[in-house]
UniProtKB/Swiss-Prot annotation:
Its main location: secreted. Disulfide bonds join 42-131, 44-60, 59-111, 65-138, 66-104, 73-97, 91-102. It is found in: Secreted. The keyword Signal applies. This is Acidic phospholipase A2 inhibitor chain HPD-1I. One of its GO terms (molecular function) is phospholipase A2 inhibitor activity. It comes from Vipera nikolskii (Nikolsky's adder). Expressed by the venom gland. GO terms for biological process: arachidonate secretion; lipid catabolic process; negative regulation of T cell proliferation; phospholipid metabolic process. PROSITE patterns: PA2_ASP. The lineage of its organism: Eukaryota, Metazoa, Chordata, Craniata, Vertebrata. Belongs to the phospholipase A2 family. Group II subfamily. D49 sub-subfamily. Heterodimer: slightly affects neuromuscular transmission acting presynaptically. It has a low catalytic activity, a low anticoagulant activity and weakly inhibits ADP-induced platelet aggregation.
Length: 138
């Protein structure tokens, strides 16, 4: 079981700060990030390719696009400050790079929350080998 946890942490932790983004996801969806989004569709989790499979997967695609726009800020490892105020995620960094990464994660968490009803268990642990359609443009 511990090995599975470590593998899941490595997979979802590839983009953004795992614990920070996971906390945002939990607040907005009520779902644990590692169990629900670490390997989902073509974009949630490790990398991404092909066409997003549903609205939930499109949230992760949009986050990948957002990270692409702030790549100089090291979005995969950035540690930023944020808080929850009246149910809202508030990014608090004065550092523009860290704030930009936080805003990418914030937008993705909000999107996942707004689309939690589209979550399809058929896309859990979805093989990237199925993600062969041409990708949309960011």
């Amino acid at each position: 079981m511990r090995t599975l946890w470590i593998v899941a942490v490595c997979l979802i932790g590839v983009e953004g700060n795992l614990f920070q983004f996971g906390d945002m996801i939990l607040q907005k969806t009520g779902k644990e990030a590692v169990h629900s989004y670490a390997i989902y569709g073509c974009y949630c989790g490790w990398g991404g390719q092909g066409r997003a499979q549903d609205a939930t997967d499109r949230c992760c695609f949009a986050q990948d696009c957002c990270y692409g726009r702030v790549n100089d800020c090291n979005p995969k490892t950035a540690t930023y400050t944020y808080s929850f105020e009246n149910g809202d995620i508030v990014c608090g960094d004065n550092d523009l790079c860290l704030r930009a990464v936080c805003e990418c994660d914030r937008a993705a968490a909000i999107c996942l929350g707004e689309n939690v009803n589209t979550y399809d268990k058929n896309y859990e642990y979805y093989s990237i080998s199925h993600c062969t359609e041409e990708s949309e443009q960011c």
